[in-house]
């Protein structure tokens, strides 16, 4: 029985558990503070709240009665709600029927209202029918009166127009004709009426007669053949121009064409192709002539033509078109006589004249012209050629002093740019050839100056400075580019770029690479073999202080040239036409300067490396098995440190402006010296325990010196670059591990082999063989050791074999020879 009650209670509890969302909705709709309504109601806690102490149990009967009373009230409420829901369905159906009846009544009322509205509308139409007829009659009457007035005005105007035309009263005709034309527009829809059509035809006839009459008057006043009529313009012609404004635009264009043609007829005679003044050396006279003609026109005919005709500008523009055609014709005929100075003189005078036109005229008559307005290049923050606009209005001459002229404010766009000077573009090859010749002479002068003046003097403040010749070269490049961009931004700019590329390569070869100190006495030029390869036991001459400074100076110059060449490429792309941008590419030239930088660094590395070779050779020839005690660092270490302290501060001070390349020098020296040091370590055999300890001490000393290499001998101590530190630590730690393996006892063999694999992580049997030779083991012992070593080697990962050996061991002579051949081919390809 008790079990059934427990199951029932558990079922009730489970049934009362509601979802959190449902519980939250109930609490929102029926908020309650009663603990019994809480979702997390706990009966034990509730009872403990009612009876907190044993004494409170005395009131248990009272509490039970209250709860029973509350239960009875809840039961009554539940019964009331249940009874209330008994008739809900019937009440709902009744309410729905009542709603449907109400809707039907509403539809009936709406229909009645609609019928009444239609009847009201019909009644209003009947009432206003007569009023609408009156409105239409009034509107038609007004239109008829207006039309009759217009007809009267048109008829009278046509009669007056014909009479005034016969009497050439152009002043009155100008105003009357415009009015007649405006009135005639009102009769466009009545052209089917014969009388209206007749009036329209009379107006057209009057217009045609006026046009022919005005053209005849201008032909009489300004005949196409013969000289201009003396005296100023008549008032009749001035009024005729006002009439022409109202007539067909072709009349106006014909008047303008005849007048300009007659006005420039003298120019065509004076500057015929066979005349002496027609050649480029007297091009000033052409522009002086048109200036006089424009002044003469303003004085005599300025008031004759309406201001909106812009006759002065039209005369100037037509002069430009004629001049461009005539100059192009004569230059084709006498192309062999064109010299660069003459061409630049003519272009400079022409561009000055075009600038004068831009100041005087707006260019409004060029809307349908043949000259395309040039697009302004986008603004640039590039420091290269930042003051290039300063030479735009100056005379174009090929002198270095032009680069020092003060910067002028940027001039606005010139709508007349190229209107005449376009004819010179096909002949700009003369200018390009001249620049080719000038640059060739400039490079030869740089070579001669370097030979005469010699390398820069060794000075801490000046050593490693950029050679002055490279600044002169780029200043000249700047002036050439500005000149050419003023002349043309098309194919001539591409041709000039090709010239720039040619002499950048020549500068890199003749001035930079050609003056690098040679490492051999052979008469051949600098080769990569002489930079990288040395014969065993040969004596390599050490560079002097002057030669070290020269190498650093060439390196700094190459870096400057590389950066400036990149800026030059960007500026050329800004100047050239958008369709030609892809043809500007100076990557090959920047690569050339990069090779010069690499060669310079390699020379510095080789010099210091070669200086350390005798010390390393001495180390390998010492009798290390006879060393009896460990002392201070060995003499060969002192010698290496001495060479480093002599060379590195000089190189660092001379490369102060190019810190990244000094870092490259340090990295390349470490990559060269450390493998060579390890190779010489392997030559030290046999080695006693004490000898190995001395070598370990020496190796640690060299490691400390190499770590301090970037700031050695400097008053300002800087932290070495992390990339350099990693190389030194990795390489010299390998040397220390080799010596520690040599110091370890070879008995038992298994422990020795495992210790070797653990310390060196080198799976190469050649390296292990060298370690055994350093320990002085006999061949029989070495054979067993090698066999054990092969057995104890860990299995390499798939696809990888001897990775540790490849990454840690020094390159073999065959590998080095292959690298040298590849590098030689690369340099030949670039240079």
UniProtKB/Swiss-Prot annotation:
GO biological process: endocytic recycling; protein transport; retrograde transport, endosome to Golgi
Family matches, as Gene3D superfamilies: Methyl-accepting chemotaxis protein, Vacuolar protein sorting-associated protein 53, C-terminus
Polar residues: bias regions: 800-815
Alphabetical keyword list: Coiled coil, Endosome, Golgi apparatus, Membrane, Protein transport, Transport
Coiled coil: 54-141
Mode of membrane association: Peripheral membrane protein
ATP-binding in keyword set: no
Region (Disordered): 370-391, 794-819
Keyword Lipoprotein part of the UniProt annotation: no
Cellular location(s): Golgi apparatus, trans-Golgi network membrane; Endosome membrane; Recycling endosome
A GO cellular-component term linked to this record: cytosol
Task of the protein: Acts as a component of the GARP complex that is involved in retrograde transport from early and late endosomes to the trans-Golgi network (TGN). Acts as a component of the EARP complex that is involved in endocytic recycling.
Similarity section: Belongs to the VPS53 family.
UniProt subunit comment: Component of the Golgi-associated retrograde protein (GARP) complex. Component of the endosome-associated retrograde protein (EARP) complex.
The protein's name in its UniProt record: Vacuolar protein sorting-associated protein 53 homolog
